[in-house]
């Protein structure tokens, strides 16, 4: 593994999205980035910040502007690559822990049998993590965030997934199983 932490970018760029009713959604995403960057600096952890937009596009520039509001004084780098190379999956696979808010990439990470941390600092009941316990944090406290992240990083994958006390393949099937299920359904129609 190349990285300790993969932070999933979740910029609040579209005022017409499903999270419009959550007034602190954007600030929650910003706070997650602040906490993650601070922790990585303090603990000398290797971070990859995975963007959802392509570099030098309008949305890519807006994504950087969004995080500049929260991380401006800190130097930060968002990896913005063409989706055709599946950069988010690559970075998740190369990381010990994936951190985010509501991104489907967190479920994808579970499907890849990778550790995740859902950060729901918004307090909104509209946002529900499919996981709880070690895999979720709700209190917007840097001290609690740091403690939880370091705890997860100290656990083996087996101990982490055993502590979830759920069948994580019910949250997201491994990619090979997803392909098999789709392939089997297509064959039924042939």
Language-model features: where?
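Donor nucleotide-activated moiety binding/catalytic core segment of transferases
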Residues: 52-112
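Short, surface-exposed amphipathic charged segments that create phosphate/polyanion-binding patches used
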Residues: 1-6, 88-97, 152-156
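Hydrophobic/aromatic beta-strand patches that form the interior of the parallel beta-sheet core
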Residues: 6, 48, 97-99, 117-119, ...
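Alpha-helical elements of Rossmann-like donor-binding domains used by nucleotide-donor carbohydrate transfer enzymes
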Residues: 34, 144, 148, 181-185
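Conserved catalytic-core segment of nucleotide-activated headgroup transferases in glycan assembly
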Residues: 1-67
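C-terminal alpha-helical cap of glycosyltransferases
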Residues: 172-190
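Residues at the C-termini of beta-strands that transition into short coil/loop
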Residues: 9, 51, 82, 120, ...
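Catalytic binding pocket for nucleotide-activated donors in carbohydrate/polymer assembly enzymes
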Residues: 66-68, 72-73, 104-173
